[in-house]
Structure formats: structure tokens, C-alpha cells
């Protein structure tokens, strides 16, 4: 199959409404970001981000098409005119040229939905829910975001182990009460300090949300609210997974979906972009310390 045929198949089988807006050719994020789509496809590498290392691994696996969820050259729209003198850009471009690799971004079509258990489901967050093992606990399976779950009760320690294993993380940033009992979990929209953060704060309080798994998150609004709530003895916490880290599970799930869509005519493989963060532990100190609740209530 030609790469162009594969791209067409991916677009045609997906939903056409992304976050409430029709997918339009002039405005969609989903574009061929690099390479010649008229060549025969030798293999497809699925990844959240086509990093330099992902490109190298794709070449070693014999793949000449990378399907990525995020931009290739570090900016919305993947504009490259401003990067001509950038040495990292030049090296990444040379690597793509050396191996004849195409990069196609599949963002809007994946979020618009893939066929799953009947109706269309957001391809990223259905994949996240599936690989976390939380589909039976999803309170609104057809929602994009927020995703809300009522899982069997667990401790912070148990949740940490589950997240580190499923997402294959180097560590995870934690905010809140380390003694929290977790059952009601929410994956919210990005927490960016916008006025809408007040609605999320109200929802956490009103619906008794125990735990947030966050993507983008600034250090004020909801983050500071959760810290104060935990210090006041409430059963609240945040696992700050990170935008790219969290959505990576969705791309991992997409491998099996795309392979079925193409009737296994082309090999499809997942290459993990890897944890966006590394952690340098404080020697001789607790990595996560939390004052006793009664210090704040006395």
C-alpha cells in the first residue's frame, strides 16, 4: 500500500467532529509533516511524538511511515521557516532524509473518534481507559474530556504503582494527601489558569472527586486548591502525569486498531516516545514530604 492510501484510510474511518468543530482541511492539525506519501509503505511506527530516537528506532524496524499524535518541529502548525538555522532542526531533518521517512500527524481524527464497542469513541482516551483497565468503571464512556471513573478503592501507593507500570514512567509528580483513599477519579481538560478552572474546582468539591490525573497543569488555581484541601484533611490528590505521557497510552492502543483497519497488510508497531520527565532524587531527603494534617488544624 502507498503511504497516501493509508493516510486516506485513517481519515475516512474516523469521526469528523473534533472537540465540537468539523475537521476542515485548511485548519486541521492532521497533515503530512514530512516526506513523500507516494512511496510504498514498508512499515508503520505509531508514537506520541516523532522524536529523534523514535525516528532512529523506526528506521531500525524498517518503517518508513511514522504516525504521531503531536507536532514534529516543536510548534503549532509545524512551521519550519523560522528554523532553517536551528542546528537541532537540521539534524532531525537529515535523519528523516537519510531513511526516507514520512511523518503524518493524527491528532484531530483520533480525538474525533474511532469505531469502538459500537459508536465512535475518542481514540486517545478510549485507549487510555482500555490500557488502564478502567473501561468497566467509566461513568460516561462516550465523553472525550473530562473522563470520570469510579474505580475500586485503592491507596495512593497502589495507584502510584499502577500508573508507573501502565504508563512506564520514570516517576510521577504528586500533589495532595498521601493518605488519600482513591475511588472517584477524573482526567480533566488542561488546567491552564483559565476562568474555567473555577468550574473544575467547584466540580471536585461538589462531586467529591478524590483524584485527578492531569495533563497540562499550571501551579496555581486547581493545584493550589488541592494542596489546601489536603492540608485541611480532605481526601484529595493529583497525579501530574503530563500531557504527552498520558496520551501515549492512546497511541499504544491505536496500533491494534490500525493493524485491523489495514487488514494486517502492513506491519504496524508501537514505539514509545518515553517519559517526558526525568527525576533527580534529593540525596538523604524524602522525595515527597507532606506535613501532618493536625499541624494545620491545631
Where are these regions (language model features)?
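Active-site catalytic microenvironments in core metabolic enzymes, especially phosphate/sugar-handling
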Residues: 1-298
Amino acid at each position: 500500500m502507498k503511504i497516501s492510501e493509508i493516510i486516506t484510510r485513517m481519515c475516512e474511518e474516523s469521526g469528523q467532529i473534533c472537540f465540537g468543530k468539523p475537521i476542515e482541511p485548511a485548519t486541521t492539525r492532521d497533515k503530512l509533516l514530512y516526506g513523500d506519501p507516494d512511496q510504498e509503505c514498508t512499515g508503520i511506527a505509531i508514537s506520541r511524538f516523532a522524536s529523534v530516537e523514535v525516528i532512529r528506532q523506526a528506521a531500525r524496524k524498517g518503517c518508513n511511515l511514522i504516525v504521531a499524535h503531536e507536532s514534529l518541529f516543536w510548534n503549532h502548525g509545524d512551521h519550519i521557516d523560522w528554523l532553517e538555522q536551528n542546528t537541532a532542526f537540521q539534524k532531525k531533518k537529515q535523519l528523516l532524509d537519510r531513511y526516507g521517512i514520512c511523518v503524518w500527524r493524527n491528532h484531530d481524527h483520533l480525538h474525533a473518534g474511532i469505531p469502538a464497542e459500537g459508536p465512535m469513541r475518542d481514540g486517545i482516551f478510549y485507549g487510555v481507559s482500555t490500557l488502564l483497565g478502567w473501561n468497566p468503571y467509566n461513568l460516561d464512556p462516550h465523553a472525550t474530556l473530562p473522563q470520570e471513573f469510579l474505580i475500586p478503592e485503592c491507596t495512593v501507593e497502589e495507584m502510584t504503582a499502577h500508573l508507573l507500570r501502565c504508563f512506564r514512567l520514570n516517576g510521577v509528580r504528586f500533589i495532595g494527601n498521601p493518605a488519600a483513599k482513591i475511588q472517584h477519579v477524573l482526567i480533566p481538560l488542561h488546567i491552564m489558569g483559565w476562568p474555567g478552572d473555577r468550574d473544575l474546582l467547584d466540580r471536585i468539591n461538589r462531586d467529591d472527586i478524590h483524584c485527578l490525573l492531569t495533563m497540562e497543569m499550571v501551579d496555581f488555581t486547581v493545584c493550589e486548591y488541592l494542596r489546601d484541601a489536603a492540608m485541611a484533611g480532605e481526601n484529595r490528590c493529583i497525579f501530574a502525569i503530563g500531557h504527552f505521557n498520558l496520551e501515549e497510552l492512546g497511541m499504544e492502543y491505536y496500533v491494534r486498531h490500525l493493524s485491523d483497519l489495514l487488514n494486517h497488510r502492513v506491519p504496524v508497531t508501537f514505539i514509545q516516545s518515553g517519559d517526558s520527565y526525568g527525576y533527580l532524587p534529593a540525596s538523604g531527603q524524602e522525595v515527597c514530604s507532606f506535613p501532618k494534617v493536625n499541624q494545620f488544624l491545631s
